[in-house]
């Protein structure tokens, strides 16, 4: 399971930890990602998605059908 949101396409970023003495060490900023099941009324089935918190807000705002269509158009989801 890759750490990529299937709705927004968000993935981990690389940055620096900066100490008080301003030394920089590499670190990873991970996505707030979780697996959630949704009931897709148009297809009459359950769909399991790896989504971020921002992806969940997108689904709440647009609806599941519109969010999945948008993600498929952008290439984040193979549906």
Curated annotation (Swiss-Prot):
PANTHER family: 39S RIBOSOMAL PROTEIN L28, MITOCHONDRIAL (PTHR13528), LARGE RIBOSOMAL SUBUNIT PROTEIN BL28M (PTHR13528:SF2)
Keyword Ribonucleoprotein recorded: yes
Keywords for this protein: Ribonucleoprotein, Ribosomal protein
GO molecular function, one term: structural constituent of ribosome
Protein name, UniProt field: Large ribosomal subunit protein bL28
Pfam families tied to this protein: Ribosomal_L28
Superkingdom field: Bacteria
Cellular component terms (Gene Ontology): ribonucleoprotein complex; ribosome
Protein family according to the UniProt entry: Belongs to the bacterial ribosomal protein bL28 family.
Alphabetical list of InterPro entries matching this protein: Ribosomal_bL28 (IPR026569), Ribosomal_bL28/bL31-like_sf (IPR034704), Ribosomal_bL28_bact-type (IPR001383), Ribosomal_bL28_sf (IPR037147)
BP-aspect Gene Ontology terms: translation
């Amino acid at each position: 399971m890759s750490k990529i949101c299937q709705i927004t396409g968000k993935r981990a970023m690389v940055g620096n930890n900066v100490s008080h003495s301003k030394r920089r060490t590499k670190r990873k900023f991970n996505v707030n990602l979780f697996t959630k099941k949704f009931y897709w009324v148009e297809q009459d089935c359950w769909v399991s998605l790896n989504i971020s918190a921002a992806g969940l807000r997108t689904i709440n705002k647009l609806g599941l059908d519109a969010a999945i269509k948008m993600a498929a158009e952008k290439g984040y989801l193979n549906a």
